[in-house]
Every structure is written in C-alpha cells, then in structure tokens.
Regions:
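Phosphate-group recognition and catalysis centered on beta-loop-alpha active-site segments
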Residues: 1-105
Length: 105
C-alpha cells in the first residue's frame, strides 16, 4: 500500500499550492497527487477545477485564460497557482512519486 497526499497537504493548506506540496513532503508519505489543466496559451497548470470559482473565489475558466492572467491569482492564504514545471522542480531529487491526473476543459 502507498500513501499519497491528494492535492498536497490539502486538509491543512490551500490545495495544489506550493505550500501544500512542501508540507506534504515533510510527512511520512510515498508521493503526492496533482491535477493539471491547459491554459489558453498552452501552459500546463496545477489546478483541479475548470474554473477559479471555488479555489480563488472569482470567476474565470482556466482554458480561457493565459498564464500571465493566472500567475498572480490568490488560491488561498497568499498562495499562487503553480505550473507543472514548478512542481517538478520542487520534487527534483526527492524519493517521492508524483501522480498526475489530466483534466479537460
């Protein structure tokens, strides 16, 4: 059996944020799970929902926005949305597995 932090340490920190992943990696787990979506300009962002409504409290569909429009959006406690590349950098050199679920617009 493998223990995986779903959306990072999402029970305590804003889901899918760098803080949630950093804190999850401090736990005795085997890996982390994330969801990814494409922005209008083709960037791969770490985001579960198709819109910003629930996580950021504002309207906006991920697939209809460019990364420049999304990069500054607060997803809770001052945390910002991540690119998949940023999450990969965070995990580099660590023994943890990364489970990626792709989402569609």
């Amino acid at each position: 059996m493998k223990i995986v932090a779903h959306r990072g340490y999402s029970g305590k920190y804003p889901e899918l944020s760098s803080l949630a992943f950093e804190k999850a990696l401090d736990l005795p787990i085997h890996g982390v799970e994330c969801d990814v979506r494409l922005t209008r300009d083709g960037k791969v962002v770490v985001q579960h929902d198709p819109t910003l409504d629930r996580t950021a409290g504002r309207p906006g569909r991920i697939s209809k926005l460019d990364w420049e429009e999304l990069r500054g959006v607060d997803i809770g406690r001052g945390q910002r949305m991540m690119l998949l590349d940023e999450l990969l950098e965070l995990l580099e050199g660590k023994p943890h597995h990364l489970y990626i679920e792709t989402k569609h617009p």
